[in-house]
A protein has these predicted regions:
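Positively charged, polar, low-complexity stretches
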Residues: 2-44, 49-88
Length: 88
């Protein structure tokens, strides 16, 4: 197993086992839908986001509160634009 494969597995697990159900669902679905599209740098950026406390991520995503803790990169922009329930 390569380092990238190991990192992907860790990210998949951590994104779905956060501690709050809302963030488990949001991050778990986001990661599940995008993990194979991410470059090595994107995976590192995503891992950095997963180290941020749920409360901060929740406010940033759901309440649209800006946070200096959230990095401004491609992955955070994709997450910000991610919608759990899209009309099909």
């Amino acid at each position: 197993m390569t380092n990238k494969e190991i990192l992907k597995k860790q990210i998949i697990y951590r994104s779905a086992h956060r501690g709050s159900k809302e963030m488990d669902i949001l991050l778990g679905n986001f990661v599940k839908g995008h993990i194979d599209d991410f470059s090595d740098d994107d995976l590192k950026n995503l891992e950095q986001i997963l180290f941020i406390e749920d409360e901060i991520l929740y406010r940033w995503y759901f309440d649209k509160k800006d946070s200096d803790v959230i990095p401004n990169n491609k992955v955070s922009k994709m997450l910000k634009d991610f919608r759990l329930y899209q009309n099909k």
